Amino acid sequence: MITSAGEKTLWQECGLRPEDLMQWADIKYDENDIGAAPASGSWKNTGMIVVPCSMKTVAGITSGYSDNLILRAADVTIKEKRKLILVTRECPLSTIHLRNLHELSQMGVIILPPVVSYYNHPESISEVTGHIVGKIMDCMGMEYQHFKRWE
């Protein structure tokens, strides 16, 4: 699922369109399709990751305001007690942001800001990105070959 705002961000920051990501996707859902499978608790999945997660999306999830498929799927993920990982990237954070993130954390949501780790001495943006992807995958219980653990 990619929101219209997500599509703009993808293009502005990466020069990519949603079609460019389809090689890694099985299904593409429209953000306005509230009747899609991820909107139902009976749809089996391991969990949900929102990357990047805007503070608007954080606010919507916190308040249960499910006006698009991402917000509804996150709401269902929380109610079904499945893993929800939000890769937030706002900086600096306001008190409102922190309150919303705290509230979600209290619900068991994993807040994972894409913080650069220097202990592995990254030499490229690709290595920094790989480390962040590794952290996300690790939280989902999945292995990522480019993730260097602390030794």
Regions found by a protein language model. Give the residues of each.
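A cross-family phosphate/adenosyl-ligand binding-site feature
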Residues: 1-85, 91-151
